[in-house]
Structures are given as structure tokens and as C-alpha cells.
């Protein structure tokens, strides 16, 4: 029988991938729920003005519409995908910075994160809930187009070989949270905030008025009603999770999920079912969570530590391993 996850979010994420707990009753926040990047955006703000909420939601939507969407013709990624194999395409400074950062993660991860998987993403079509397993020939054809190594950058211009397409979606929500953080940091009326984009990406910003820590509960990847533990965080942090339960279907007893291994063209099989990364950059956090999932616990842990990030891995047998720094932030649910 085919199974799918569904996206649900109540006030401050009660049924999502990551959940905020422990808000102060003495200094109640203002909460908003909106929609952008094809998912729910939740804002919990400690402020005496709610004007900033609309600015954040619009900025998050603009990240996709202006830069990242593969479906909006006017977005930069769409223009690159349609023209960069014919002649170099000039990028804005913003997208150029994104590409520089993501290609660095690609190199450091040995291609476990690869922003050039657009053809594979379109083939599997998880965004439209496709449950069709592509043929080996079609997957091989996509792989033949090349990889991140074949992306040619010259200053702020980019060229791609024929067939190769960009897809920055694996880092998109993290990029959106970086944008949200820049807005929050420019508003002195905001002392603290938690912003989530979808179920998988969260920003904790500043502090609550009472000085207490942020508490982010991590969902059990095999039981959406349960948690495996809680992260205790102070100040500003980004939390990104990649899991095989977020978008998937099952056929013949096998789970086909949306986190593709760029080296095989198939859903990654690395011995883990969920990876949560904590670091100080949204774009790097999301890229690392994908790369660490593809690499598996041992190599993924090395990659996270290279970036000064912390990571929590849930293995196939549901055992949990994590970086030493994560141990200091972690409270087990059991």
C-alpha cells in the first residue's frame, strides 16, 4: 500500500518535523501562520509590533519567485536552466553568492550535495506526488548530463553543459531563513523569534524576554505523534532536517523518498532515516543535512564537524548517534 506524509502545522508547529516547546507564559509571543515556497511558514515573534511579520513572509516568497523556482519562468534558476547551455548567463550578486556557497559544500561532500540534480528531480517529480519509478535508462540519461563539477563559473556568469539543470531546492528553505534573519536583525523591536519554513527548517533568533532557552523537539521519523528528544538552544541557530518520511511513496515493500543520491540517481540508501543539523547559516545547514543524509552517519559526522556544525543521525534501526557538540544540546525523550 502506498503511503505519503502530509504537512500539518498548528500554532508553533505541533505536528511537524520540528516543534517549539516551552514558551514563556509571562512574556507571550505574537504568532502568525502564512504560506510561501509551497509550504506553511510559521512565525513566533517576541515584539511589541507585528508589522515585521508581513515583511518576513513576503521576503521568503521573494526568495523562491526571484531566485530559486524551477517553475516560474522569470526566476533566475529558470532562466539559467533554459539558456545556460547555449551561452553564459549573468547572475545577480545574490544568486552568485548562493552558488559559491553550495558548490563549496558539493566539493567538501564529494558530491553528496549537488545543486545540478534538476533533471533527476524533474524525472522523479516528488513535488507533484508522482509515484512512478523512473526507468534505469532515464536515470542513466540524467546522470550522463554531468554533475556539479561541470558547472562553469566565470565571475558572475554561469554556463551548463546540455541537459544539466540546477535545483537549489534542498537548500531553499535555509536560504529563506537567512533572509528572515537579516530582517529580524534590522528591527530593534524584536528581541527573539522562531521562524519555520515547512516542517524541516527552523530559525531561532535572539532570546525570549525571560532569558530562557529555546526548546526544539525532534520528531520520531517513524511515529509522527512522538518525539525522540529536544534540542536546548540559546541565541540564534538554524536547524535543518532531512528525512525519508517527508516526501515518499512505497512500492513492493520499498520506500522511495525524495532525497536523491546524485551518484546513483536513486533515493539515498546510507543507513540513516533522518538527519538534523544545527549551525549558524541557513543555506549551509540545509545543504549539510542533505549531504549528511546521503553520506550516512560516519562520513556525515565528519562533514558536519568540518563546518563547525552539529548533527544528529537516526539510523535504520532507529538508534541515534550525534556529534559531541550535539550531545551537549540534547535531551532524550526516553
Name each model-derived stretch.
Residues 2-334:
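Mature catalytic core of soluble alpha/beta enzymes
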